[in-house]
Protein backbone atom coordinates (compact mmCIF):
# COMPACT_ATOMS: atom_id res chain seq x y z
CA UNK A 1 0.00 0.00 0.00
CA UNK A 2 1.40 3.44 -0.88
CA UNK A 3 2.70 5.41 2.08
CA UNK A 4 2.86 9.14 2.66
CA UNK A 5 6.03 11.19 2.62
CA UNK A 6 7.36 14.45 3.92
CA UNK A 7 9.02 16.32 1.08
CA UNK A 8 11.56 18.88 2.21
CA UNK A 9 12.97 21.82 0.33
CA UNK A 10 16.68 22.33 0.94
CA UNK A 11 17.88 25.93 1.16
CA UNK A 12 16.14 27.88 3.89
CA UNK A 13 14.44 24.77 5.26
CA UNK A 14 17.24 22.32 6.05
CA UNK A 15 20.31 24.50 5.60
CA UNK A 16 20.93 28.20 6.01
CA UNK A 17 19.83 30.31 3.04
CA UNK A 18 23.05 31.85 1.72
CA UNK A 19 22.31 32.00 -2.00
CA UNK A 20 24.11 29.70 -4.39
CA UNK A 21 26.53 27.54 -2.41
CA UNK A 22 29.88 27.44 -4.18
CA UNK A 23 31.88 25.96 -1.30
CA UNK A 24 30.79 22.76 0.44
CA UNK A 25 31.68 24.14 3.86
CA UNK A 26 29.15 26.93 3.36
CA UNK A 27 26.29 24.43 3.58
CA UNK A 28 25.34 24.62 7.26
CA UNK A 29 22.25 23.17 8.90
CA UNK A 30 19.66 25.42 10.48
CA UNK A 31 19.69 24.69 14.24
CA UNK A 32 17.26 21.93 15.21
CA UNK A 33 16.82 20.61 11.67
CA UNK A 34 18.65 17.31 12.16
CA UNK A 35 16.58 16.52 15.24
CA UNK A 36 13.39 17.38 13.35
CA UNK A 37 14.28 15.04 10.47
CA UNK A 38 15.20 12.34 12.99
CA UNK A 39 11.78 12.75 14.60
CA UNK A 40 10.17 12.14 11.21
CA UNK A 41 12.42 9.10 10.71
CA UNK A 42 11.46 7.70 14.09
CA UNK A 43 7.76 8.31 13.44
CA UNK A 44 7.93 6.28 10.23
CA UNK A 45 7.69 9.05 7.64
CA UNK A 46 9.46 8.68 4.31
CA UNK A 47 11.67 11.79 4.15
CA UNK A 48 12.52 13.10 0.72
CA UNK A 49 14.44 16.14 -0.46
CA UNK A 50 12.70 17.98 -3.32
CA UNK A 51 14.63 21.05 -4.37
CA UNK A 52 15.11 23.37 -7.34
CA UNK A 53 18.87 23.68 -7.85
CA UNK A 54 19.50 25.77 -10.95
CA UNK A 55 23.22 26.36 -10.35
CA UNK A 56 24.23 23.95 -13.14
CA UNK A 57 21.83 25.58 -15.62
CA UNK A 58 23.20 29.02 -14.73
CA UNK A 59 26.79 27.73 -15.14
CA UNK A 60 27.60 28.55 -11.52
CA UNK A 61 28.91 25.04 -10.85
CA UNK A 62 28.64 21.46 -12.08
CA UNK A 63 26.00 18.85 -11.41
CA UNK A 64 28.68 16.94 -9.48
CA UNK A 65 28.92 19.89 -7.09
CA UNK A 66 25.18 19.61 -6.37
CA UNK A 67 25.64 15.91 -5.62
CA UNK A 68 28.54 16.78 -3.31
CA UNK A 69 26.38 19.34 -1.49
CA UNK A 70 23.69 16.72 -0.96
CA UNK A 71 26.29 14.25 0.29
CA UNK A 72 27.44 16.87 2.80
CA UNK A 73 23.83 17.52 3.81
CA UNK A 74 23.29 13.82 4.49
CA UNK A 75 26.54 13.66 6.46
CA UNK A 76 25.58 16.65 8.62
CA UNK A 77 22.11 15.24 9.32
CA UNK A 78 23.56 11.87 10.29
CA UNK A 79 26.34 13.31 12.44
CA UNK A 80 24.04 15.73 14.26
CA UNK A 81 21.16 13.40 15.10
CA UNK A 82 21.39 10.15 13.17
CA UNK A 83 18.84 11.62 10.73
CA UNK A 84 18.37 10.33 7.19
CA UNK A 85 16.83 11.60 3.99
CA UNK A 86 15.38 8.48 2.37
CA UNK A 87 15.63 9.96 -1.12
CA UNK A 88 16.97 13.05 -2.84
CA UNK A 89 15.35 14.67 -5.86
CA UNK A 90 16.42 17.96 -7.35
CA UNK A 91 15.92 19.92 -10.53
CA UNK A 92 19.07 21.42 -12.10
CA UNK A 93 17.13 22.83 -15.05
CA UNK A 94 16.13 26.40 -15.79
CA UNK A 95 14.62 27.74 -19.00
CA UNK A 96 16.62 30.20 -21.07
CA UNK A 97 14.20 33.09 -20.39
CA UNK A 98 14.72 32.50 -16.64
CA UNK A 99 18.52 32.48 -16.94
CA UNK A 100 19.51 28.98 -18.03
CA UNK A 101 22.64 29.09 -20.21
CA UNK A 102 24.11 25.56 -20.12
CA UNK A 103 22.54 23.62 -22.98
CA UNK A 104 22.09 20.35 -21.06
CA UNK A 105 20.01 22.12 -18.40
CA UNK A 106 18.58 25.18 -20.17
CA UNK A 107 15.02 24.19 -20.85
CA UNK A 108 11.55 23.84 -19.45
CA UNK A 109 10.90 20.73 -17.37
CA UNK A 110 8.08 19.21 -15.38
CA UNK A 111 10.55 18.77 -12.51
CA UNK A 112 11.02 22.45 -11.73
CA UNK A 113 8.78 23.67 -8.94
CA UNK A 114 5.93 24.44 -8.88
CA UNK A 115 5.57 21.63 -11.44
CA UNK A 116 5.03 18.22 -9.91
CA UNK A 117 7.69 16.13 -11.67
CA UNK A 118 9.96 15.55 -8.68
CA UNK A 119 7.10 14.44 -6.44
CA UNK A 120 5.52 12.26 -9.11
CA UNK A 121 8.88 10.59 -9.77
CA UNK A 122 9.40 10.01 -6.06
CA UNK A 123 5.89 8.60 -5.70
CA UNK A 124 6.50 6.23 -8.59
CA UNK A 125 9.96 5.19 -7.41
CA UNK A 126 9.02 4.65 -3.75
CA UNK A 127 5.29 3.81 -3.83
CA UNK A 128 4.18 7.03 -2.13
CA UNK A 129 0.69 8.42 -1.64
CA UNK A 130 0.88 12.11 -2.54
CA UNK A 131 -2.62 12.81 -1.22
CA UNK A 132 -1.39 11.96 2.29
CA UNK A 133 2.01 13.60 1.89
CA UNK A 134 3.38 16.97 2.98
CA UNK A 135 5.61 19.51 1.23
CA UNK A 136 7.61 21.75 3.56
CA UNK A 137 9.22 24.81 2.03
CA UNK A 138 10.11 28.45 2.47
CA UNK A 139 8.79 29.76 -0.85
CA UNK A 140 5.41 30.27 -2.44
CA UNK A 141 6.48 27.89 -5.20
CA UNK A 142 6.80 25.13 -2.58
CA UNK A 143 3.20 25.72 -1.52
CA UNK A 144 2.13 25.90 -5.17
CA UNK A 145 3.84 22.54 -5.71
CA UNK A 146 1.95 21.08 -2.76
CA UNK A 147 -1.34 22.30 -4.23
CA UNK A 148 -0.47 21.03 -7.71
CA UNK A 149 0.49 17.60 -6.37
CA UNK A 150 -2.46 17.30 -3.97
CA UNK A 151 -0.26 17.41 -0.85
CA UNK A 152 -0.45 19.37 2.36
CA UNK A 153 1.73 22.47 2.18
CA UNK A 154 3.65 23.93 5.11
CA UNK A 155 5.49 27.24 4.84
CA UNK A 156 8.39 27.69 7.25
CA UNK A 157 9.43 31.19 8.29
CA UNK A 158 13.12 30.42 7.89
CA UNK A 159 14.84 31.18 4.58
CA UNK A 160 12.49 33.27 2.44
CA UNK A 161 9.38 32.30 4.41
CA UNK A 162 8.95 35.56 6.29
CA UNK A 163 9.37 37.54 3.07
CA UNK A 164 6.71 35.41 1.37
CA UNK A 165 4.33 36.10 4.24
CA UNK A 166 4.91 39.85 4.16
CA UNK A 167 4.45 39.91 0.39
CA UNK A 168 7.97 41.03 -0.54
CA UNK A 169 9.07 37.78 -2.23
CA UNK A 170 7.33 35.77 -4.96
CA UNK A 171 3.56 35.88 -4.43
CA UNK A 172 0.90 35.24 -1.82
CA UNK A 173 0.26 31.62 -0.97
CA UNK A 174 -2.19 29.69 1.16
CA UNK A 175 -0.29 27.04 3.11
CA UNK A 176 -2.11 24.54 5.27
CA UNK A 177 0.14 25.60 8.11
CA UNK A 178 2.74 28.28 8.79
CA UNK A 179 5.59 27.10 11.01
CA UNK A 180 8.37 29.05 12.65
CA UNK A 181 10.90 26.46 11.46
CA UNK A 182 11.19 22.82 10.49
CA UNK A 183 10.92 21.65 14.10
CA UNK A 184 7.55 23.41 14.42
CA UNK A 185 6.45 21.99 11.07
CA UNK A 186 7.35 18.49 12.23
CA UNK A 187 5.44 19.03 15.46
CA UNK A 188 2.34 19.90 13.41
CA UNK A 189 2.86 16.93 11.10
CA UNK A 190 3.29 14.47 13.95
CA UNK A 191 0.29 15.90 15.81
CA UNK A 192 -2.15 16.15 12.89
CA UNK A 193 -1.14 13.50 10.37
CA UNK A 194 -0.29 9.82 10.48
CA UNK A 195 2.60 8.29 8.52
CA UNK A 196 0.80 5.01 7.84
Swiss-Prot record:
Compartments, as annotated in UniProt: Cytoplasm
Record site feature (Stabilizes the phosphoryl group), residues: 51, 113
Residue sites binding substrate per the record: 9-11, 17-20, 51-54, 112-113, 139
Record site: Contributes to substrate recognition: 112
One Gene Ontology CC term in the entry: cytoplasm
EC annotation from Swiss-Prot or TrEMBL: 3.1.3.-
CDD domains for the chain: HAD_HisB-N (cd07503)
Catalytically driven reaction(s): D-glycero-D-manno-heptose 1,7-bisphosphate + H2O = D-glycero-D-manno-heptose 1-phosphate + phosphate
GO term, biological process aspect, one: carbohydrate metabolic process
Keywords: Carbohydrate metabolism, Cytoplasm, Hydrolase, Magnesium, Metal-binding, Zinc
Binding, Mg(2+): 9, 11, 138-139
Cofactor: Mg(2+); Zn(2+)
Active site: 9 (nucleophile), 11 (proton donor)
Listed GO MF terms: D-glycero-beta-D-manno-heptose 1,7-bisphosphate 7-phosphatase activity; magnesium ion binding; zinc ion binding
SUPFAM superfamilies referenced in this protein's UniProt entry, alphabetically: HAD-like (SSF56784)
Pfam families: Hydrolase_like
Subunit structure: Monomer.
UniProt record similarity statement: Belongs to the GmhB family.
NCBIfam families reported for this sequence: HAD-SF-IIIA, Histidinol-ppas
Name of this chain's protein: D-glycero-D-manno-heptose-1,7-bisphosphate 7-phosphatase
Source organism per UniProt: Thermosynechococcus vestitus (strain NIES-2133 / IAM M-273 / BP-1)
Lineage, top ranks: Bacteria, Bacillati, Cyanobacteriota, Cyanophyceae, Acaryochloridales
Amino acid sequence: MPRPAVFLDRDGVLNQEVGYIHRLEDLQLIPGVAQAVRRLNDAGWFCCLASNQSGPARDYYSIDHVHALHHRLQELLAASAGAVLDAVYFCPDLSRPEGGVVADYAGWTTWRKPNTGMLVAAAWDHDLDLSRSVMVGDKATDIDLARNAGCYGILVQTGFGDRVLEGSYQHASQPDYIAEDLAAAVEWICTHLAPR
